[in-house]
């Protein structure tokens, strides 16, 4: 019977603040190699939107094409909300043009459509069609592929009435970045195959779903952790060492008194400095500082929010420093 590989929310973004370019490129290339290896166990790969984080740069397009032109099984793609240009439209339209993707295994659906692989029938409901409330008609036995934000209590509300998806026996969704079943419905999010923002939990898993159909109605769903390098944020106390990780990209928040933080040099490993509340015992190290620098340190010490404007105003007094 049919085996389905499902991924979503790759968010290819090579020019991300505080993320080394070559490390990010290498991370995606490692992901591509693992996806190609998983293809050997599957009949079809569904990519449920948000391959890109935003309108891509040329190097990001080339990176995507290096993978997509290498896939060896039928691969179906729908755009997500990050690939939308205006209501109902997506820049993925450009990838449907002749010779944009030179691999006959790949099909991009920017409009509602259907396709079959073996005994599996798919109905595609891209993000732009959802925006226009153009739900495709239900065909018995179809698997729905779409990109819709579900509810994440208490702050994230659903953008669609999920009860309308209930006729489909299985819905493969993109948007939410963590792997889970949506409530008690037949809707499943594979989550992102790699973390797209800095995590504090190094053990959190990211990957893809594999569906193994035992007959035309029953299937087994398996989550596969791709174990890719992660973006990690750690918090340490001033004086602790910021250690470079050989696999993950780790940045550090450093806490301490204002005088302790003033002695910490800015490096690629430093995310930000967090000043502890000032106390009577804390003293500012004002050696080799001019008057403007002293004022800047003092304003930060007493936690003035708009210290830059205060310093700029002070400079207009033209005091000899």
Report residues per predicted region.
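Active-site neighborhood of phospho(di)ester-bond hydrolases with catalytic His/Asp-centered motifs
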Residues: 6-8, 45-50, 75-86, 107-112, ...
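Conserved beta-sheet core of the metallophosphoesterase superfamily
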Residues: 154-219
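Accessory, non-catalytic peripheral segments of nucleic-acid enzymes
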Residues: 44, 213-321
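Conserved catalytic scaffold of divalent metal-dependent phosphoesterases
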Residues: 83-164, 193
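Beta-strand-turn-beta hairpins that frame and shape the catalytic cleft
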Residues: 1-6, 114-124, 139-143, 184-187, ...
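Active-site regions of enzymes building and remodeling cell-envelope glycoconjugates
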Residues: 105-108, 119-122, 141-144, 158-159, ...
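Metal-dependent catalytic neighborhoods of phosphoester/phosphodiester hydrolases
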Residues: 15-18, 49-67, 84-103, 156-161, ...
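N-terminal active-site segment of His-dependent metallophosphoesterases
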Residues: 1-63, 67, 135-141
């Amino acid at each position: 019977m049919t085996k389905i590989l499902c991924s979503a929310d790759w968010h290819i973004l090579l020019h991300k603040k505080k993320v080394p370019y070559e490390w990010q490129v290498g991370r995606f290339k490692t992901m591509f190699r693992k996806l190609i290896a998983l293809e050997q166990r599957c009949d079809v790969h569904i990519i449920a939107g948000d391959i890109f984080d935003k309108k891509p740069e040329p190097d990001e397009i080339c990176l995507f094409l290096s993978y997509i032109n290498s896939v060896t099984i039928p691969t179906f793609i729908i755009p997500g909300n990050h690939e939308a240009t205006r209501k109902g439209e997506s820049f993925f339209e450009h990838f449907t043009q002749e010779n944009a993707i030179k691999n006959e295994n790949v099909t991009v659906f920017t409009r509602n459509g259907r396709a079959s692989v073996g005994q599996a029938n798919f109905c595609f409901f891209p993000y732009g069609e959802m925006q226009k409330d153009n739900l495709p008609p239900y065909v018995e036995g179809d698997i729905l592929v779409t990109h819709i934000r579900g509810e994440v209590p208490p702050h994230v509300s659903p953008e669609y009435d999920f009860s309308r998806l209930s006729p489909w026996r299985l819905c493969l969704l993109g948007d939410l970045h963590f792997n889970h079943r949506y409530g008690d419905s037949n809707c499943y999010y594979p989550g992102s195959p790699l973390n797209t923002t800095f995590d504090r939990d190094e053990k959190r898993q990211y990957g893809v779903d594999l569906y193994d159909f035992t007959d035309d109605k029953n299937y087994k769903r398996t989550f596969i952790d791709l174990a890719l390098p992660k973006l990690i944020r750690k918090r340490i106390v001033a004086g602790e060492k910021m250690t470079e990780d050989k696999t993950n990209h780790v940045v550090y928040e450093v806490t301490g008194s204002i005088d302790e933080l003033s002695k910490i040099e800015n490096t690629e490993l430093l995310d930000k400095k967090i000043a502890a509340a000032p106390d009577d015992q804390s003293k500012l190290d004002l050696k080799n500082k001019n008057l403007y620098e002293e004022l800047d340190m003092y304003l930060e010490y007493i936690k003035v929010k708009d210290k830059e404007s205060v310093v700029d105003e002070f400079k207009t007094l033209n005091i000899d420093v």
